[in-house]
Amino acid sequence: MAGFNTGVAYSKLFNVVDPKVLEPKKEDLQGRKMFKVNTLADPWALTYEWSWKEIMGQSSGYADRATDITVTDVSYHKEIGYIAERTAAFEYSQADLERANTGGRNIDIVTDRAVATHDALANWEDALIFNGNGDDRHPIYGLTTDANKAGYQTIDDPSVTLQKVVDPTNENAFSDAYKIVNYFMDAAAKITMLPGYHNVKPYLALAPKEYDLLTRPLVNQYNPDKTLWNMIQRGGNNGENVFAGIRPITELEAQYWNNKTGKDGKKDMAIVYLDTPDVAQIQVAMEPRRYGQAVASADNGLSYKQMYIERTGGLSVKFPAGIVQLAGLNDGSEKWAKSKADAKAERAKKEN
């Protein structure tokens, strides 16, 4: 590499790095797959506000000259949400560039570090949306926050796990499958039975392992292609789907939120929810952006460091009852559903 052109290096920072860092890719941001984004007018706001109304009163009978006629009333309640911020920095030097492109190496170190910076901010945003900030003074609740604290609905664990239902050795697969189907329908009904929500259809989000199990074939010689997915999305309500959609969300795996020990600490979570702004939305004050200017460091201008910043309120939950936490779909034993080949071999072994 003949020399180091600081002008070229500086332009790389913005022509190559910025598109990687600043573009909020939806496939990388799990929370944005589930909820819509609301951008605040003030990027440096410390808080944001919203109001909800409480309607009281009822009609009454009337008699001539009656004076005890009931009066209705509407009260407006103001809520305050908090904004959190996080920064991530990107740096590279002449030595980095030369080392990455000599000795038979051809490494795009600029792009790789830009992606790492993007991922750092994206991971923080998702952690805030799903886990909250754990700050008692300025709380931001996440989807996996304790339901009693956040006000979410819950449902008792199902009587069977998804692993058991789809296990090829399960001779009662269809009977167990209907238990799971009814469990999901009961979870959806927690929302659809609320006043004013009878005609809505919630979404289901669950960990990728459980999502995969929904697509595994059930043991049945007459319907070999039958799956839990078919039954959930073709069952009840005259053949209509139970959910508006089913989404695999990595952040719902136990390793990202579950602080318990033993088997309980390996149980994943699922969420049944509405994605409308009246229930919840992601409050963004400032999308990832450059913070300040990249200035050449003291080593004769041979390296640059640029900081990026994001400011967000995480998930603003306005109607907690529109979110239902589900647990117990896996038992934490780490036992995976056996393949058909394994099950067949096991049966043959027993027969011999």
Give the location of each predicted region.
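Alpha-helical scaffold segments that mediate packing/assembly in large oligomeric complexes
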Residues: S93-N182
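Long, hydrophobic/aromatic-enriched structural stretches that serve as scaffold segments
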Residues: L29-N106
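Helix N-cap / beta->alpha transition motif
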Residues: E91-A95, L206-K209, F319
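A general structural signal for short secondary-structure junctions and capping/turn motifs
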Residues: I80, L194-G196, A296-S297
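Sequence/fold signature of self-assembling virion shell proteins
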Residues: M1-T47, S51-W52, T215-N352
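Hydrophobic, Leu/Ile/Phe/Ala-enriched alpha-helical segments that form helix-helix packing faces
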Residues: L121, E125-L128, F184-P195, I232-G236
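Extended, solvent-exposed, turn-rich assembly/linker loops in the middle of proteins
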Residues: T144-L228
